[in-house]
Amino acid sequence: MILGLVAAGCKKKVAPVSERIAKAWTAESVKHGATVVYTRGGSGNIEAAYSGFRLTLTNSGGTKTVSLTDVDAKTFTGNWDLEGDTKLVLTNLTPAPTGSGGKLEFTINSIDDAKVVLTRLTASPKTGGTINEYTLTNP
């Protein structure tokens, strides 16, 4: 009984999503709708340009900033925040991504220390109006 209590007391505390997500992420795989268009290291990628995709989320003294380099190699900067633990919101993006009004929203499907899976909540004009899913890793 005592051994069980000691073992239970030694569990590693899981950092909040706001801490785990604040890092530089690169694309491991990307889906446009149900179609996988990019897999890191893949030879038959439909959208090989995702090799340059980068989402960098920083939190410095409570100031949350984002830099997003998209599939077309354009970089957008702004702010980010979470709504609960399941929604990532990028705001004040400059220049504003096409049709976004400077705001992009993603569902956080899953997250751990080295991987996050995000689904964009609105269709992307850049990818023919698809809802895209991004599996991102760090490093």
What are these regions (language model features)?
Residues 11-77, 83-139:
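Lipid interaction determinants
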Residues 1-12:
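Sec-dependent bacterial lipoprotein signal peptides
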